[in-house]
Amino acid sequence: MKFKNPKIKKLYDYLSLKSKKAYRDHLLISNPVLSKQETRGRVFETYLADKTPLPTSFYLIAKKIIVYLVKNLISFVLCIIAALFHLISGQKFHVKDGVDYVLLDTFFKIDHIINEGKFKEAYFPGLPEYLSDKNIDYAYVPKWFGFKNPLRLLRIFKILRKNQVPVLTQFQILTLADYLEIARFIFLYPFSLSRFLRKLESSYEDKVLFGGLWNTFDDVAYESHMRYLFAKRLTTMKFGNIKCISWYENLAADKNFYRGLRTFSRKTEIIGAQLYVRPDTLMNIFPDQSDISFDLVPDKILVNGPGFCYDLDSVKVEVGPALRYKHLFKDAQEESFSGEIILVVLPYWDHLVCEILGIISDIDWPKPVKIKFHPTMNWESYEQIIPKNFTVTIESIQKLLPRAFMVVGSS
């Protein structure tokens, strides 16, 4: 895989080697650091800045383990409550026996659905309508973004049922045995990660990885494993053949989902859709060659244009439709560009949001600054560190871009 920065390439290759060893224990496929994701473990930032990783004390380790158990068990209980609420809601998808299906694996943003009172396709606009026009049976297999409160999910289930959205959720098909397996994962995962940590040695890269893994040790880990169980349970349903079109960011949850689908006895095709403008600095976006042997990579990957293609053994990488960017071409012809604002577009990683807000507050900007938070973020959580002369906007990016003199973001 080619990166413009040779240090990123070196870090990518190092993590590739370590993840290949780690994934022999399937529980570690759920670890986001080993998936090369951006995390608060700050492996990427620490390595590129040549910083010395902070030492890990016994107190920190004990604290991380306790917080891990508390956070994961509370989240697991909320997940079980959500499953009960799903049963109460009556939301259900009926699979036609022996019929081929297209499964749309994409994010469902909870706040957006509740605020709008309906589900609006944001990642594959136009695709559901196309499938319906062609009389192709399809169903969503959603990745929930922003799930914390089961009561909010209950509202979502009712909205989906009322609007007759074809959604097949994990809450419908996971069994008691699956929930017991999740509980087992919660208790065994720390031991798997600890065994891997003990094998790390004294190189600078090992120290950076060691610190990153411990800093994220207390994250909620079981959700990625639940995607594996969900996909595996999907394969027991009476589908004909399955074609899965997946919004593909190569996250730990994606890898687990594909691994589960590969247990299907009939024909399964997985298409990973990278139909977005990707930054070269996000390592997880680029599939790892060594992941293929673990069944963690799609059969085909669609990218946003010829400039985004890359070589990957035994996996086709082709140009797909830029479904989300139609407005850019339309606006370029129909709208004038005023250049009246500085537009700051923030990511969905908390530590980077805080860092960017700190940087931009020290600059004397020549024009009014408007801050656009990621749709999944609650901007009010950052109200105290947003400069008073800056404005937070909820306008769409389509309306903001023609007004921007400069756009500031993270990459």
Language-model region placement:
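Catalytic-core helical/loop segments in enzymes performing group transfer/polymerization on anionic/lipid-linked
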Residues: 1-411
